[in-house]
């Protein structure tokens, strides 16, 4: 549908005329056929974070989508690139990320501590592990469970973490009705959080674990049931 809209907009801009729907459908069908049976070139599709699939368990190159450019990350450093080998899917809810400043002083992840209300050193290290893991694609993720009294800053911590990893105009999910209400949004976010959830059943628990670890069943649901 995005391609159809782009095609109609491009034709209107170039020729000042609106394409008939029948012509649009013919172009789309021809493009799909060429892509599948002639070109046959495939691209890895990422959502906010991705990697070049070199078959290794420890990726040597990571890519992070800023929304209008991409950060290429290696063990030697990072750079902003405009034409990465990764194709990122950008959803309407996503916001552009702040561009990192290569001229700033050496970053210190401990500076994040002054923005979050985590007192225990052990809890703080667990939180940092969660944040760092969110930037590693195709990797089993831990599930972060925040507990505190009312007004203890749980929602604030998750909103900050969401904006740090995967900025979005959407807030966290307040209700989980079924497994589908997890799988669908999880396929459109690099980081997803649930707010004020008091109970989950076994099926939902299993689905959450599947999303975190990337099981094949959950992945199949993501890519076959993605249309809203």
Residue ranges of each PLM-predicted region?
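Conserved AAA+/SF3 P-loop NTPase catalytic/coupling segment centered on the Walker-B
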Residues: 191-212
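Conserved catalytic/switch belt of AAA+ P-loop NTPases
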Residues: 162, 166, 205-227
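Short, intrinsically disordered, charge-balanced linker/junction segments flanking boundaries
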Residues: 1, 114, 224-228
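P-loop NTPase catalytic core of nucleic-acid-dependent motor ATPases
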Residues: 77-188
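Charged, alpha-helix-enriched surfaces in structured cytosolic catalytic cores
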Residues: 2, 22, 26, 122, ...
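Conserved RecA-like P-loop NTPase ATPase core
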Residues: 131, 155, 161, 193-195, ...
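Segments of Walker-type
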Residues: 2-122
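Conserved Walker
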Residues: 172-181, 197, 215-228
